[in-house]
Amino acid sequence: MVKSRNTTTAHVHDVPRIMGGIKKLKLTKETAMAAGRKLKTLLAKVDAVEKVCVICMEPTYTKKTLAECDIEGGALRVTTMPCPTHYICDNCIRQEMEDKCPICRKDWPERRIIYGNEAKLYKYWLIDNDDIMILENNNDIDELTPEEEDHLLSDDESDNYVPRYTLDSLVEEVLSERSQMSNDRLMNDMIDNIAVNNAIDDDCIIIDDYIDLTI
């Protein structure tokens, strides 16, 4: 992981787990891209770096932010390294069969968010090119049985989902957390429960990532 000063680095690994209620939301590519640009501008500025994959040893030189987002199946996703210690290129990541770093054997981080004053879990699944399915649990965090999962996935009319953040309020909270934490904590702790819900007219964008506030 690049430890540049005033850097916010996002790590994501796709480990979906089923949580409580469900809701389908429409998302336009333009809305997602606009929100992604704003998030990157405010939270993820890094200098150009050369990174070498620890598996294939091929170098990658890039000027893009480590929290670069792209559009995949209608969802805005962060596409950076899931291991905070060892850089592995996208090609090698795709060939990994386990949810662990092949070097240090640490589990890939889960994706989580913070909303309000409590840390709770959100997960999303991509449904098709335009839809996102939100899986939410407002109470205790429990994994569902396969039978419960099948029932939940058929319940398209659930009203359990309520957006918790605008893009601006997420930025405000992240920067507030950053200013309150000591340098040592910033180097070692993850503010891991972060996502963005930004409603624009009838569109809602979801950004779900794992953010390491490193200075």
Curated annotation (Swiss-Prot):
A zinc finger (RING-type) spans 53-105. The keyword Zinc applies. It comes from the Viruses. SUPFAM superfamilies: RING/U-box (SSF57850). One of its GO terms (molecular function) is zinc ion binding. PROSITE patterns: ZF_RING_2. Keywords: Metal-binding, Zinc, Zinc-finger. This is Putative zinc finger protein ORF121.
